[in-house]
Amino acid sequence: MMCGLAALCLALSGATAAAAQEKCVGDGPHLKVIVEGLRNADGYVSVELYPDDPKLFLAHNQQLAVAHDKLTGMEQVVCLSVPKTGYYALSVYHDENGDDQFNRNKFGIPTEGVGLSNNPKIMFGLPAFEKVRFKVAEAETTIRIGLRYFLGKSAN
């Protein structure tokens, strides 16, 4: 768990609000991400889009698009423009305290909610890349991501 969580933590710690759109408008394909399982409506939700390359997934500064949106409720919709149709992967985290960082305890365990595209189990390491990749079609593709909290209360 620590190795996979460490990679996820490292990748999410550098999220910035770049290349994101608040609404699914404009030309080209769009990705509508519905973030579920928030344990509260505090802070922000960060969504990162990665290319179809296992070596680049969660790698520092390899995101194709990043959104860092203020939460408006217990479910958040985030829209991203994607470069073209094809396969991608997503990571999401709940920046609960709004400090623009993915917080962890002294053992490296996330103290904020995390999720990946296709909602694979995150147990003792990151899932295989094939489990997180998904296809963006023409126009708009919708994907739902449920957050998981390793510490403290979860939404459920």
Q: For each predicted feature, which ranges?
A:
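Bacterial N-terminal signal peptides
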Residues: 2-14
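Extracellular beta-sheet/turn segments enriched in Thr/Pro/Gly and aliphatic residues
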Residues: 21-23, 31-32, 113-150
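A short, amphipathic beta-strand motif
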Residues: 29-37, 47
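Beta-strand signatures of extracellular beta-sandwich domains
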Residues: 46-50, 91
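Short proline/glycine- and polar residue-rich coil/turn motifs
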Residues: 68-74, 135-137
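Exposed aromatic-hydrophobic patches
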Residues: 76-82
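A short tyrosine-centered beta-strand micro-motif
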Residues: 86-92
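Acidic, glycine-anchored loop motifs typical of Ca2+
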Residues: 96-104
